[in-house]
């Protein structure tokens, strides 16, 4: 039986000391008759907040999943820090902190969904800790190449002190010296570094690519998957989509449907897509989006006091 109950997510705060924290939102399963094996963590892409994934969380919850979202440190959103101090390693630390927090609450079976830049972080995390499955959407595999396409220039070829500090990426100041230094110091930059991290990955893994993605090369994603020593991998294409999965409602709905179908299957260690899912209606999605916006604004006002 479908449960169309809508509400705001449960708000949590992970305190880290030094007056820093990570904000986490929890969405409980909307359909209690379906029992899933895993809690799903959603890692949003660069310059995206957790509330940008309200629709996906609702789709997953409508199909029986317990869903966790968070805002990274030094990023946009409700967690501590400014985005001009963001680095891939900070993003990785944030994700690992959320997963450890879940384990501290007795939640050990965890699947991860990551998009865009966060997918590159997810590849590192999946190689280092026990996850049940990994799903990526328009996931970055060659960070240097993606940055060059997005910024229209390969700034990583420059001496660190010559790189402009105010590079605009997705409408935000990247804080280029911090970001680039971390890329080189911790081997985030190349396709080879991603391949080396994931070659021994042996969990169900589904990668969604977009046929109109100008930032991520489909052949590089296929090369990454082809180098994995696993028979639990699959690539699906989101037809008609670019790197921006929210560019229109048709693309967005296809993204929600496809990822939900994938999550249901990999939750049972299968890498095909299930045919039927329970979709929330448009009114429910509108209500949850408005509720999350109100919650975000309420928390943001408290944070500036």
Curated annotation (Swiss-Prot):
Alphabetized UniProt keyword annotations: Acyltransferase, Luminescence, Transferase
GO molecular function, one term: acyltransferase activity, transferring groups other than amino-acyl groups
InterPro entries in UniProt: AB_hydrolase_fold, LuxD
Any single biological process term in GO: fatty acid metabolic process
Keyword Acyltransferase (UniProt): yes
Enzyme class: transferase
Active site location: 116 (charge relay system), 213 (charge relay system), 243 (charge relay system)
Top-level taxon in the UniProt lineage: Bacteria
Enzyme Commission code(s) on record: 2.3.1.-
Pfam families (UniProt xref): Acyl_transf_2
Pathway named in the protein's UniProt entry: Lipid metabolism; fatty acid reduction for biolumincescence
Function field: Acyl transferase is part of the fatty acid reductase system required for aldehyde biosynthesis; it produces fatty acids for the luminescent reaction.
Family assignment from sequence similarity: Belongs to the LuxD family.
Stated name of the protein: Acyl transferase
Organism, scientific name: Photobacterium leiognathi
